[in-house]
Every structure is written in C-alpha cells, then in structure tokens.
Amino acid sequence: MELMTVLLPLAALVSGVLFTWLLMKGRFQGEFADLNAQLAEKAARCDFVEQAHAEIASELAVLDGKYRHLQDENYALGNRFSAAEKQIAHLQEKEAESVRLKQSYIELQEKAQGLAVENERLATQLGQERKAFADQYALERQIRQRIETDLEESRQTVRDVQNDLADVGNRFAAAEKQIAHLQEKEAEAERLRQSHTELQEKAQGLAVENERLATQIEQERLASEEKLSLLGEARKSLSDQFQNLANTILEEKSRRFTEQNREQLHQVLNPLNERIQGFGELVKQTYDKESRERLTLENELKRLQGLNAQLHSEAKALTNALTGTQNKVQGNWGEMILETVLENSGLQKGREYVVQAASVRKEEDGGTRRLQPDVLVNLPDNKQIVIDSKVSLTAYVRYTQAADADTAARELAAHVASIRAHMKGLSLKDYTDLEGVNTLDFVFMFIPVEPAYLLALQNDAGLFQECFDKRIMLVGPSTLLATLRTVANIWRNEQQNQNALAIADEGGKLYDKFVGFVQTLESVGKGIDQAQNSFQTAFKQLAEGRGNLVGRAEKLRLLGVKANKQLARDLTERANETTALSESLEYVAEDEAV
C-alpha cells in the first residue's frame, strides 16, 4: 500500500514529463522543419546568386575579350588608316602629275590618238591599283570610297582630255625615262641601304673583334707581367744568393786575407758583377720591349676603333669603283684596299711585308722576265707569301643592276668567268720561281669586294678547288685579315722565343761563370789555408820551440852583437817562454827515461 502510494505520484510525474517532452518535441520538430525550409530557400538563393555571379563573370570575360579585340582592331585600323593616308597622298601626287599632263596635253593637241592607247593602259593600271587598295583596305570604306572617287575623277579627267592631246608621245617617253631613272635611283638606294646594312654588320663584327683583341691584350699583359715578375724574382733571388754566398765566404776568409788577396778577389768578382749587370740590362730590355708591344697592341685597337669611320669613306670609293669602267682605276683601288688590310693587320711595312717588290724569273729560253707582285709578306725561317690583288667588278655591277632573272644569271656567269680568267693569268706568272724569293706553294689572289668574292664562291662550287689545284688561294678582306693577323701573332711569338733563347743563353753563361767563380774561390780558400799552414810553420821556426830563430838572435844581441834595431818585446818573451817550456819538457822526458 505504501509502495503504491509512492509509485502513483512517481508515475504521474513521469507521465507529465513524457507529455511535456512530446509537446516540446513536436514544437522543436516544427521549428526545425521551418529552419530547414529557410536554409533550403537561402541555399537556393545562394545558388542563384552564384549562378548569376558566374554568368556575370562570363559576360565580363566575353566583354573583356571583345574590348581587347576592339582595341586590336582599332590599332590595326589606325595602321591601315595611316597606310591609306600615305597611299592617298601618293594618289594626290599622281593626280597633280595628271593635271600637269593635262596642261601638256592642252598645249600639244596634235597627237591625241597616240596617247589614247597609253591612257587606256594607265586607266587599267589605275584600276588594278584601285582593286589592290580595295582588297587591302576593305575595312576603311570611307577611305576606299574617297580613293575610288579620286580614281574616277582621274579617269574622267583623262577621258576629257583625250580629244585635246597632241605631241605628247615624246614628253611621255621622257616621263617614262625619268620614271625608269627614278626606279634605278630607288634600286641604287636599296643597294646603298644593303651596303649600309653590311657596313653595320661589319661594324658589329669589328666591335666583337675589338672586344676579343681587348681580352687578348689583357691576357698578354697579364702574361707579360707574370713573366716580368718571375724574371724579377729570379734576378732578386740570384742576386741575394750570390750576395749571401759571397758574404759568407768573405766573412769566413776575411780575417785571413791580405791586401793582395783582396785585390785578387775583386778581380775575380768584377766579371761576375758585370754579368749580373748585363743580365739586369737584358731583363730591362725585355720589359721595355713587352711595354712597346703592349703599346703597339693598344694603338692597333685604336685603329680598329677608327676603322668604322674609314669604312664609310671606303664605301663611297667602292661605289665609284663599281660604276667606273677603267681597269687601271679599279686596280689602284684594289691595291689601296689591300694596303689598308695590311695596315690593320699589325704587320710592319718594310720589315714584315713589302709592297710592289720587283724580282725576275728565268724563262725556259734562257731569258729573264721581270715580275712585280703587289705584296710580299715575310714569314719566319726566310719564307714569303705572295699576294696579288685582282679587281673583277664590271660584271658584278651589271649583276647588281639586273632587272630580271635571266640578265642576273648571265652577268653572274660573266662575273665568275672574269674571276676564273684572272686566276688563270695569275697561275701563268708562276711567282714560286722568282729569284731571291722563297715563297710558299701557293699564291693569295685577293678580291677586295667581299660580296663579289662570296657571290662567286656560292654560285660556283668548283671555283675554289680549281684555284687550289693551280696553287692559288682565293681570299677576301675578312679571310685575308684573319690570315695576316695570324702571321703577326707568329712574328710576335718568334720574337718572344728569340728573347727567351737569348735570356736562356745569358743565364747559361752566367751559371757557367758562377761555377768558375766558385771553383776559383775554393782554390783561393785552399791557397789561403796552405799559406796559413806555411805561416804557422814558419812562425814556429821563428819564435817557438827550442833553438828558434828569435831566441838565437836575441842571444847574439845579449852576447854583444851591435845592432841599431831591436825585436819586439812580446816576440822575444814568447820565444824565451817557448824555449824554456821546451827545455823543461826535455828534462822531464829525460828524468822519466832514467
């Protein structure tokens, strides 16, 4: 009963709690459903916003691309508009020329029929130009319409004046000649621009060469400084060793030398000092020569820096030579270019190369033939290189001025044939048999115009081999300059080798002299030792031992021998002491014997 009393309230409490929980659960579920609905709505809105944002971003990207495309089109249209304005100006010039022709046509009305055909050709040409301009500038409609209007007006003007044309054929022919002349001038201007481009390339090449030479000069300077440093250290080391050795020997023997021995030693040392001074002079001369060579290289670098300015004047001279027809003038110009290359190669005129050196050659019939090569380049070991300048430019000039491919091919063949003819003529001279000249097995044939030289080799692959078979080497300015610079370096190395041999020879002589000096000095020392031993023996006989000369002489004085001089006291005392000591030793020896 009591249990029921307790359980009933508890059950009621539990029921209330469950009921309350169910009510709260239903409320919470409703609120949770509302929250889920709100979240779903917000998620849908977010998706919509993101989709809209993506669409806006896509549209912005498309608009940005269109904007850039429009900018590019605007830039292209601007360029085309500028080009069209230039064409319009050109057409306006042509229109002005048409007006001038119209005035000429009005003045000369008798030959209208002859000009009609030409006017039709001009109209056709203008139509072709109009079509080309229309195709090229399709986007510029207003400009195209203006061009078409101008062309139509020009054609109408031409048609209006056709009935009034007179003696205009000659004038129009003159105009055609003038146009052809202008075209030639334009072609010449194009060639000059190409020449200018080539000169700029050469200038760039020279700049690279300048940098290379500067690097080479710096390397040679460092090598020379290192050599001089080593020579200076060797000289200082040898001098210190000689001085230390001489001082050591002199310090050991100085207390034994007499005035006569010192004089003899000076006589022995003087040749050694002279050799050392000669070695120092040789080192100084080597340093001065290296300094002069560095100065020569610096001057050469300055000349190379000024070569760009010289090329401009040489280009003008080249133009005059190309347009000239006198072979003598072209030959002189080729020799001038050859001498310019030689001057810039670093070789010394008159010493390492000779210009226009005359010589003779014996013929098979017993006679002699006088030959005069343009340049003889001397090599070490009494060898020479023969260089002969050959200018072959007439056909080359016509080739550069050719109006069509057939003419160009014909003139190119003539240019190669001209070079081959020069080569055959040079091979007949046979410079290798000149008296007093020890040439190599081949001769350099110098072509002063680099493009003409390269053009011939590029279009005739067998030309170089044919020249080589005839012991002729084809060279242009660049290849010859590289070869001559190599020869200059060979001469510098030869001079340095000769200096090194001279230094080695002087060093060998110095070493031999030093060995002789040491041997002589050893002999002097031995002689001094022998003299010292003889001196000690003689001194013992004089003042030491029993019966020495000083004691005997002093006894004679004490016995009454008349003398004007007297021996030194310390010498007589020493003689008496040694005599007494000797007698005492003899007495002791006798007592021991007894």
From Swiss-Prot:
Q: Name one GO biological process term.
A: DNA recombination
Database matches in Pfam families: RmuC (PF02646)
**Would I find Coiled coil among this entry's keywords?**
yes
Q: Which residues form the signal peptide?
A: none
- Spell out the coiled coil positions from the record: 31-330
Keyword line: Coiled coil, DNA recombination
**Role this protein plays:** Involved in DNA recombination.
Concerning its family, UniProt says: Belongs to the RmuC family.
Q: PANTHER family, from UniProt?
A: DNA RECOMBINATION PROTEIN RMUC
- The protein's name is DNA recombination protein RmuC homolog
Its gene?
A: rmuC
